[in-house]
């Protein structure tokens, strides 16, 4: 038996040249032209080049490895490493080291067109930003002993470093996920688990093993830490609780997924009900249909454990003893933090749910790769529809339609009176509505050449938050090997 072999398996190389136009030279590209693109697209009208090469795991080997490199250049950023990683796999364990994007769920007729979901199936890591350098140790589903294959565990553990300009420079990121999967009969799977992140270190605290242990265990800071970290937990913690049902048949797969965001213990105790992202997806296993995949999502994040959060310390900084009438669970303020003020963003873009617009979006002062103070809009109500298939059973496409009502944050509402500090329901809040649409597609095998493909995109924004405009993108992809 060959334990290790450096043979190349399914080598793939691709070059994409693309141009994009918006409603004006100073306007940002429409929402879906730059959202969910791993930060590759320019923020305004311009051009983009993306070249990549990678290999795949060889399942015939006991120990398998793969590598990948990618370089992106656009009219806003001259060039940057999109991916650069080396991965090894042994049985159920996979170690990825370097710059590597997380793979998305709910893909349609062509993986190259991306996910049909706003979040890519991951509320916390949606594929909206560039990759961070670090490592991720993943565990594929492993059966729990004595359950006769009915129960399995899977997840990952990882640590990364931020490289962008931030309020706390050189902040570190700890990531972790753990899921329990139950197999019921031949067709039904139930999944339940946590997807967690923590920002720590950087110029805000020492990055040592002592603090790392307190971060991963969710402990409070020592006396040398900030007052906030001594009261709550060390660093900025957030994540999502996920519940998923998946029914698989030979010809189709149906999935329902419910993701609940949290940014403190109150969210983990479901005090923020009914906040969450609800996803319903139906897909045929054969993708050469006019419509092969249908996805609907309902987003609601207005509650955030309520608008009341009383002071936890007195004027002298002493902790006030908790009592039953004390409201300290409200104002979760997803993806924002008072100390790590860049929040859950990277290179100016929201890492998680991209309907949480980064600060400066509505005022049109936002620019990628600049210092951003978190998100300005994390209280939303939204409906999203994604469709995919193949025109004439050979040309993959993806249709995205998103309507949202946006309330800003509790502390800084977009419009009307703020509900912060007032009993729930006593204030009639005023949202700003927004509609964004996109049709993306590919025309494969131009001029009869299997390696040459045309890519296109038509985009539109209309509403009260983003500039009302149309946009278009057109590109040529040259690729060899299996995507």
Where are these regions (language model features)?
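Short loop/turn motifs that connect adjacent beta-strands in outer-membrane beta-barrel proteins
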Residues: 4, 8-13, 54-67, 89-92, ...
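Signature for the C-terminal beta-barrel architecture of outer-membrane proteins
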Residues: 140-323, 403-430, 439
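Outer membrane beta-barrel
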Residues: 69-164, 182-200
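Transmembrane beta-barrel strands of outer-membrane/channel proteins
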Residues: 15, 19-27, 65-73, 88, ...
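Outer-membrane beta-barrel "beta-signal"
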Residues: 12, 17, 134, 467-483
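C-terminal structural cap/anchor segments
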Residues: 309-414
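Residues that define the transmembrane beta-barrel architecture of outer-membrane proteins
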Residues: 43-51, 78-82, 128-138, 170-176, ...
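Residues on the lipid-exposed face of transmembrane beta-strands in outer-membrane beta-barrel proteins
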Residues: 49-57, 84-88, 135-141, 178-184, ...
């Amino acid at each position: 038996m060959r334990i290790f072999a450096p043979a190349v398996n399914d080598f793939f190389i691709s070059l994409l040249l693309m141009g994009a136009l918006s409603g004006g030279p100073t306007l940002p590209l429409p929402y879906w032209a730059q959202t969910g693109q791993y930060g590759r697209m320019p923020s305004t009208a311009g051009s983009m080049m993306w070249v990549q090469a990678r290999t795949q795991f060889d399942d015939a080997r006991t120990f398998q490895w793969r590598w990948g490199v990618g370089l992106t250049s656009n009219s806003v950023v001259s060039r940057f490493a999109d991916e650069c990683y080396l991965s090894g796999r042994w049985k159920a364990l996979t170690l990825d080291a370097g710059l590597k994007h997380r793979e998305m769920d709910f893909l349609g007729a062509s993986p190259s067109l991306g996910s049909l979901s706003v979040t890519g199936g991951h509320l916390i890591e949606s594929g909206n930003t560039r990759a961070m350098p670090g490592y991720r140790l993943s565990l594929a589903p492993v059966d729990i002993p004595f359950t006769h294959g009915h129960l399995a565990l899977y997840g990952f553990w990882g640590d990364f470093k931020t490289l962008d300009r931030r309020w706390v420079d050189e902040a570190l990121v700890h990531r972790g996920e753990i899921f329990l999967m139950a197999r019921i009969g031949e067709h039904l799977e139930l999944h339940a688990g946590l997807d967690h992140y923590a920002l720590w270190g950087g110029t805000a605290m020492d990055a040592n093993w002592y603090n790392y242990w307190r971060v991963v265990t969710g402990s409070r800071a020592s006396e040398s830490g900030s007052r906030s970290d001594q009261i709550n937990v060390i660093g900025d913690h957030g994540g999502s609780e996920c519940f998923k049902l998946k029914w698989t048949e030979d010809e189709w797969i149906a999935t329902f997924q419910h993701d609940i965001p949290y940014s403190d213990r109150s969210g983990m105790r479901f005090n923020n009900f009914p906040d969450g992202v609800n996803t319903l997806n139906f897909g045929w296993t054969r993708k050469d249909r006019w419509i092969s995949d249908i996805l609907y999502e309902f987003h609601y994040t207005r509650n955030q454990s309520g608008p009341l959060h009383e002071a936890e310390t007195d004027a002298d900084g002493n902790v006030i003893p908790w009592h039953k009438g004390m409201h300290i669970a409200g104002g979760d303020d997803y993806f924002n933090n008072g100390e790590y003020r860049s929040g859950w963003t990277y290179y100016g873009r929201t890492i998680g749910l991209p309907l949480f617009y980064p600060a400066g979006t509505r005022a049109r002062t936002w620019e990628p790769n600049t210092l951003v103070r978190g998100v300005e809009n994390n209280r939303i109500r939204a409906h999203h529809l994604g469709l995919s298939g193949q025109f004439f059973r050979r040309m993959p496409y993806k249709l995205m339609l998103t309507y949202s009502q946006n309330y800003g944050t509790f502390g800084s509402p977009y419009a009307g009176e703020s509900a912060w500090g007032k009993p729930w329901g006593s204030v009639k809040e005023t949202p700003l509505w927004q509609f964004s649409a996109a049709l993306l597609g590919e025309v494969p095998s131009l001029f009869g050449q299997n390696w040459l493909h045309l890519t296109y995109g038509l985009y539109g924004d209309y509403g009260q938050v983003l500039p009302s405009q149309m946009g278009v993108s057109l590109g040529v992809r040259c690729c060899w090997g299996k995507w």
